[in-house]
Amino acid sequence: MKEESILVKAGRKFNDYKGSMNPPVYHSSTILFPTYKDYLNAANGESIYDVINDGVARDYSYSNVGTPTVHYLSNALAEIEGSGQALIYPSGLFALTFAILTFAKAGSHVLIQDNSYYRLRRFAENELPKRGTEVTFYDPTQDITDLIQSNTSLIMIETPGSVTFEISNIEHIVKVAKEHKIVTVCDNSWATPLLFKPLDYGVDVALYAVTKYLAGHSDLVMGAIIAEGEIFKLLYESYKNYGVTIQSHDCYLAHRGLRTLYTRMKRHQNTAMEVAKWLEKHSKIKKVLYPALPFHPQHELWKSYFKGASGTFSIALDREYSCEELSCMVDHMKIFGIGASWGGCDSLILPIDRRSMSRSVMNSDYGGSFIRIFCGLEDPEDLISDLNAALARLPCLNTKTGR
């Protein structure tokens, strides 16, 4: 079955909910059992209720480990990934920090991409040292062999990196990690399983901000982790011990969003490519940081891993503009909203202050002010027209009026 068909059907068993096309939303804190023995068996992963179909013995004695609605979504995510088992988390950042805390203990050392999501970097800088974990931030375009220490337990990868969108040499990182028995975790939110499957390349853990493309409608916050074998068992034990709980209604919405993922991603990619090519030719743009563009320095590496590109990229303007000037540019846009997320239906734009981001890749000679762009589902010509008008407002001589 092709991926677009799997997306529509994944995680749903019509016979389980009396022929209804859509699974019900279960609002229940308690699971009832016919006998005490049935309860004990459920706690040991042998429930009489068939709600988890990934073949792993999971506790189903109390709904803090998930209602059927939660498990329908986790089943669907594992099906789409094509391997492994899935766990659902309250947010993408929760999933990131949870993965780190599972595999990084006091006295251990972790490697994290220099251009990772800034909230992850903040967690690594502010929280991990308190727990006795040493952190090294690495350049994703360079050889990491010399950065490995005897106590390195985890390598975090992001595909591609946040804001600057560098592509990591994933096969190199995985090879080094396996030689030293180090766990690898890949944040694959930008690509989704449609464009790249981390587990197929030997990565131990695939991680997603379901908030973004997977759910796709800007109406929930959620994360997910997919792994297999002993790695999954370690994650699952921590999952139970930390008491991670997810709301059933959010899982229903995310599961519904998955069914249109293929169509949405195709639209995001086509629109982003059209907009990016137009921006490449604009006199006020020094660089377009979108690896799908043929002239991107890592285009060939990108092609070797990814089936396509999503709708999120950055641009570097021709010079550094003041905060007031950037406000003048984006405050008056008609279609693009000013927002920190991406992956929904609506296009978003956000100036990025490089000086506030303490990472070396941001110090590279990309040009002037950074702006991140997410192309939603609107018409590409309308988006180009909106961007053209916004760029025409630079430089803003009268920032009070924006004219």
Curated annotation (Swiss-Prot):
A Pfam family per the record: Cys_Met_Meta_PP
Binding site for pyridoxal 5'-phosphate: Y62, S63, N64, G92, L93, A209, V210, T211
Pathway, per record: Cell wall biogenesis; peptidoglycan biosynthesis
Keywords assigned: Cell shape, Isomerase, Lyase, Peptidoglycan synthesis, Pyridoxal phosphate
Modified-residue entries (N6-(pyridoxal phosphate)lysine), positions: K212
Enzyme kind, highest EC tier: isomerase
Catalysed reaction equations from the record: L-alanine = D-alanine; L-glutamate = D-glutamate; L,L-cystathionine + H2O = L-homocysteine + pyruvate + NH4(+)
Residue ranges of the TM segments: none
Residue ranges of coiled coil: none
GO molecular function: alanine racemase activity; cysteine-S-conjugate beta-lyase activity; glutamate racemase activity; pyridoxal phosphate binding
GO terms of biological process kind: L-cysteine catabolic process to pyruvate; peptidoglycan biosynthetic process; regulation of cell shape; transsulfuration
Gene3D superfamilies, per database record: Aspartate Aminotransferase, domain 1 (3.90.1150.10), Type I PLP-dependent aspartate aminotransferase-like (Major domain) (3.40.640.10)
Cofactor (UniProt): pyridoxal 5'-phosphate
Enzyme Commission number: 5.1.1.1, 5.1.1.3
Record-linked InterPro entries: Cys/Met-Metab_PyrdxlP-dep_enz (IPR000277), Cys_b_lyase_bac (IPR006233), PyrdxlP-dep_Trfase (IPR015424), PyrdxlP-dep_Trfase_major (IPR015421), PyrdxlP-dep_Trfase_small (IPR015422)
Function comment: Catalyzes the racemization of L-alanine to D-alanine, and of L-glutamate to D-glutamate. The activity is low, but likely physiological since W.pipientis wMel lacks canonical alr and murI genes, while D-alanine and D-glutamate are essential components of peptidoglycan.
Subunit structure: Homotetramer; dimer of active dimers.
Family statement: Belongs to the trans-sulfuration enzymes family.
Name listed for the protein in its UniProt record: L-alanine/L-glutamate racemase
Underlying gene: aar
